[in-house]
């Protein structure tokens, strides 16, 4: 059967093959915006997320322009956009739309397995690329991280357990993302942030917490663990008051 992650990666291989047949990367360079700079103070990376394998449809018909504008007005330090179509109902068009609306750093949230996806994200306006350790071999991770640097972009290298963390640390990346969600089962455990955060604090690396953050209490918990930011999707996409969520994030620890 394979895990959810296996299914997603298999789908990505098909998409990459199709991209090589239909897409020619542009050579033009452009200015990019820095997440590292945004993380100088505690930052919310606010996500545009229409659906997910674990929750099904979340906010399928979201107005991307309006959502991104609200995020920026409320004080988001960056915006994350799901570009996976099959499992998350996103698209590169959503990323492009967000870029047209937003002046803050943009993260392309996808399952990146090939350089051509990075080219596509760059053209659509991404400043930051998510690289998921669980989805890549060590060699491929290193190759894609180098390519991110070559393009003048930043990377969030995502980990879920100790083994993945050690692989990520070897890269000395811009930012490490601790995903509280196990991508093999899609179960969430916020204690992963506390567990892995200790090691990252020792290494003095910049890191954020991702997934399962829904309340002021969750924000306090990850801040105490040493996170410099949070990536929040579902809670914001279903919130009746996005402004209140951002106010809760300003709590001092």
From Swiss-Prot:
Secretion signal span: none
Keywords: Amino-acid biosynthesis, Aromatic amino acid biosynthesis, Decarboxylase, Lyase, Tryptophan biosynthesis
Keyword Hydrolase: no
UniProt EC number: 4.1.1.48
Listed Pfam families: IGPS
Listed SUPFAM superfamilies: Ribulose-phoshate binding barrel (SSF51366)
GO biological process: L-tryptophan biosynthetic process
GO MF annotation terms: indole-3-glycerol-phosphate synthase activity; phosphoribosylanthranilate isomerase activity
PANTHER family attached to this UniProt entry: INDOLE-3-GLYCEROL-PHOSPHATE SYNTHASE (PTHR22854:SF2), TRYPTOPHAN BIOSYNTHESIS PROTEIN (PTHR22854)
Protein family: Belongs to the TrpC family.
Protein name, per record: Indole-3-glycerol phosphate synthase
Organism, as annotated: Bacillus anthracis
């Amino acid at each position: 059967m394979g895990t959810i992650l296996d299914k997603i990666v298999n789908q990505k291989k098909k998409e990459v093959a199709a991209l090589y047949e239909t897409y020619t990367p542009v050579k033009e360079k452009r200015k990019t915006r820095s997440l590292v700079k945004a993380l100088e103070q505690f930052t919310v990376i606010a996500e545009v997320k229409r659906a997910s394998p674990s929750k099904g449809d979340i906010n399928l018909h979201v107005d991307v322009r309006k959502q991104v504008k609200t995020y920026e007005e409320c004080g988001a330090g960056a915006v994350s956009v799901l570009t996976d179509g099959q499992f998350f109902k996103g698209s590169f068009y959503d990323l492009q739309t967000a870029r047209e609306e937003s002046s803050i750093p943009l993260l392309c949230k996808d399952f990146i397995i090939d350089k051509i996806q990075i080219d596509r994200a760059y053209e659509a306006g991404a400043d930051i690329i998510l690289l998921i350790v669980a989805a890549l071999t060590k060699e491929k991770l290193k190759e894609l991280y180098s390519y991110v640097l070559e393009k003048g972009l930043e990377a969030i290298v995502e980990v879920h357990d100790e083994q993945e963390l050690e692989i990520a640390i070897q890269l000395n990346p811009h930012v490490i993302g601790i995903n509280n969600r196990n991508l093999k089962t899609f179960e969430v455990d916020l204690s992963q942030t506390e567990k892995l955060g200790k090691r990252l604090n020792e290494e003095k690396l910049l890191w954020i917490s991702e997934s399962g953050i829904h309340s002021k209490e969750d924000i306090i918990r990850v801040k105490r663990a040493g996170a410099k930011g949070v990536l929040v999707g579902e809670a914001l996409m279903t919130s009746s008051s996005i402004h209140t969520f951002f106010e809760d994030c300003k709590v001092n620890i």
